[in-house]
């Protein structure tokens, strides 16, 4: 039920319960309890409000599970402000030193990640990559390039470095555009979506996976092929790509996937396709 606080604040309280330390035998065994997977949760979310509530709940419950004692003195901690912050219960904790501009409180951390769609100048080509990490049984997924920002980096320099490290493609700092961001608290990331534009000159666009061998493959895909896939896609955790596998030297028996509408990679590819269609 809605409540009002101090006459000007109102809303509906929402609580998250963490079952991470429970086993299945602890759960109520009836038809109203459904065991969810990471994918099924995303498939069941109906709008951005639900997705936001779920992501907040997941982040805070994971954070509260991860920290039990003060990282400075080892004393027990207490979660306050609805679980959005913890304080050390020891009054003489070294963290509580106002002269050093320190206090005995801590907040959830956020790790920024740059997600980059690499395109040529006229938007007709988009480089997508396949990770060595297993996505799931029988799933072959190509996506945009991604990597964590390092301390002291700008978003643009991080994007430039990640593109070169993973694909060998040489993109100039000035040719990186920040498009949008997306919270991704799995466990604690902020996805920063970028477009890296490459001038094809016989050298810049050459793919080399040997600088930091994280990828199994990376290829320049025709944007028109991606557009055909987007045109028939409705929803889901993954987007099936309607590709001519022979054209890209892929196993003719496999179905290639792209991250679905829940991921910023999908938004970036959609952005690329829209820009391409505006030019033709």
Whereabouts are the PLM-identified features?
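Short Gly/Pro-enriched turn/cap motifs at secondary-structure boundaries
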Residues: 105-108, 184-185, 210
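The catalytic Nudix box helix
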Residues: 144-179, 194-196
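Nudix hydrolase/Nudix homology domain
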Residues: 1-67, 78-80, 135-141, 187, ...
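Active-site pocket-lining segments that scaffold enzyme catalytic pockets across diverse folds
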Residues: 71-77
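Generic recognition of flexible, low-complexity loop/linker segments
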Residues: 103-104, 114-115, 180-182, 206, ...
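N-terminal strand-loop-strand
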Residues: 67-68, 82, 86, 90-143, ...
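Beta-rich nucleic-acid/ligand-interaction surfaces
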Residues: 86-87, 175-189
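Active-site-adjacent beta-strand/loop module that shapes the phosphate/pyrophosphate-binding cleft
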Residues: 182-208
């Amino acid at each position: 039920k809605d409540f009002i606080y101090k006459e000007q604040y109102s809303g509906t309280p929402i609580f998250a319960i963490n079952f991470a330390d429970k086993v299945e035998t602890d759960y109520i065994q009836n038809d109203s309890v459904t065991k969810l997977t990471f994918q099924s949760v995303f498939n069941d979310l109906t709008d951005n409000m639900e997705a936001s509530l779920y992501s907040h709940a997941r982040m805070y419950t994971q954070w509260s599970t991860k920290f039990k004692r003060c990282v400075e003195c080892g004393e027990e901690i207490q979660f306050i402000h609805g679980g959005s912050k913890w304080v050390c219960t020891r009054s003489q904790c070294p963290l509580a030193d106002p002269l050093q501009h320190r206090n005995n409180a801590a907040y959830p951390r956020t790790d920024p990640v740059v997600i980059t769609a690499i395109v040529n100048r006229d938007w007709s080509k988009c480089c997508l990559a396949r990770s060595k990490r297993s996505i799931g049984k029988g799933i072959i997924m190509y996506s945009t390039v991604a990597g964590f920002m390092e301390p002291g980096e700008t978003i643009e320099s991080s994007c430039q470095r990640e593109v070169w490290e993973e694909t060998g493609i040489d993109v100039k700092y000035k040719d990186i555009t920040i498009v949008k961001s997306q919270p991704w608290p799995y466990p604690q990331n902020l996805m920063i979506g970028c477009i890296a534009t490459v001038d094809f000159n016989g050298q810049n666009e050459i793919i080399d996976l040997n600088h930091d061998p994280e990828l199994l493959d990376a290829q320049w895909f025709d944007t028109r092929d991606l557009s055909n896939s987007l045109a028939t896609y409705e929803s889901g955790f993954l987007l099936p790509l309607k590709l001519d596998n022979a054209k890209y030297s892929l196993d003719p028996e496999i179905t290639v996937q792209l991250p679905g509408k829940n991921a910023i990679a999908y938004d970036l590819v959609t952005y690329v396709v829209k820009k391409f269609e505006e030019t033709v």
